[in-house]
A protein has these predicted regions:
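Short, well-ordered alpha-helix to beta-strand connector turns
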Residues: 8, 30-31, 83
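Anionic-ligand binding region
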Residues: 32-35, 42-58, 70-80
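Switch II (G3) loop of P-loop NTPases
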Residues: 1-23
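Beta-strand-loop-alpha "switch" segments that mediate conformational coupling across diverse proteins
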Residues: 66, 76-108, 121
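Short histidine/acidic/glycine/proline-rich micro-motifs that form metal-
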Residues: 41, 63-68
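Inter-motif core of Ras-like GTPase G domains
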Residues: 18-41
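Structural beta-sheet core signal
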Residues: 13, 35, 60-62
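Histidine-centered active-site loop/cap adjacent to the catalytic His
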Residues: 108-127
């Protein structure tokens, strides 16, 4: 990771949600942790437990969102009430995005492009 950081300046590490050893190693190597969650109450509670356990700056990325819904407003309120930073953009729910793991193709309008610069800007703000 040090070599990559020297070469590229910023290194993003994506981990699967259920491999705690891998997640712990990635968090230990991180300057900024992106906590990814859906707006669902169970997912938010799980993410909150993770947020409390890490000792790094973090920001929450809401995925599978639907604009102008009670669920999204409740999730945003949850993050605010718990003092959690979040990305300005969210990743909208799209059926094609759900199926992308089967096809191996990411839809062009997935929404991830909207948040691409936010972690880099945040990273530079804490370094």
């Amino acid at each position: 990771i040090k070599h990559c950081r020297q070469r590229f300046g910023v290194v993003l590490i994506d981990t699967p949600p259920s491999q705690s050893d891998l997640i712990a190693a990635a968090v230990d190597a991180s300057s900024l942790v992106v906590l990814v969650t859906t707006p669902g109450p169970l997912d938010l509670d799980r993410m909150w437990e993770t947020a409390k356990a890490i000792d790094r700056p973090s920001s929450v990325l809401l995925t599978q969102t639907r604009a102008n819904t009670v669920a999204l407003r409740d999730a945003e309120r949850f993050l605010s009430d718990h003092g959690l930073a979040r990305f300005d953009a969210t990743i909208p729910f799209k059926e094609a995005l759900r199926r992308s793991s089967e096809s191996g193709r990411m839809p062009s309008a997935s929404g991830y492009g909207l948040v691409a610069n936010e972690p880099i800007e945040a990273f530079h703000g804490i370094e």
